[in-house]
Amino acid sequence: MAKNKFNQSWLHDHINDPYVKLAQREGYRARAAYKLKEIDEQDKLIKPGQVIVDLGAAPGSWSQYVRNKLAASPRAKDGRIDGAIVAIDILPMEPVADVTFIQGDFREESVFQQLETIVLDATGGGKVDLVLSDMAPNLSGVASADAARMEHIAELAVEFAQAHLKPEGALLIKCFHGSGYSQIVEMFKRHFRVVAPRKPKASRDKSSETFLLGRQLKHPG
């Protein structure tokens, strides 16, 4: 019964959520687009001509937002974008115009190599400007296990950024306040000169979800 009441409460909040309504009106697949939008407006992350990687991209609202930003560039012509977007997720994702999508597990070597190949092609053998990660583990409710899973996902994103991000580039990841959060912050501080937590208004107040932004790699790969 308690679970049913929780589901009903969540459904009520979801239906009446202004960001859900805004996403439906503006054609975004999820309200998460507005989390990225707010952070981008604050930190000026997305700029014309960039190569951007979207980790944990499904259902695609972050890729949609990035695509819209790059398509708005004065240099974008014939309906194309000024830049490149590479997205990956273990789940399927409906196509987003101008976004190269890989379905696969980021942790598998063959999938990782496919991602690297596409990134190298998009950059002409160079580095990317921005790595976005909305990846999150399936939470078990066991704090220590969930913290370890979240930290592992953060490590994967940092390792990818270390190898493929421009020295002046940025990494934005989703994480959760609680057990293990301080370890993720310390890891970011080891790798980035500028580290800043972000809690956009579109992130629900009840949620422990937060975002961590790292800029300017200390030891680029």
Curated annotation (Swiss-Prot):
Top class in the EC scheme: transferase
Transmembrane regions = none
Keyword Iron appears in the UniProt entry: no
One GO cellular component term noted in the UniProt record for this chain: cytoplasm
Query: Where does it live in the cell?
Result: Cytoplasm
What role does it play?
Specifically methylates the uridine in position 2552 of 23S rRNA at the 2'-O position of the ribose in the fully assembled 50S ribosomal subunit.
The name on file for this protein is Ribosomal RNA large subunit methyltransferase E
Organism this protein belongs to: Ralstonia nicotianae (strain ATCC BAA-1114 / GMI1000)
Q: What is the lineage of its organism?
A: Bacteria, Pseudomonadati, Pseudomonadota, Betaproteobacteria, Burkholderiales
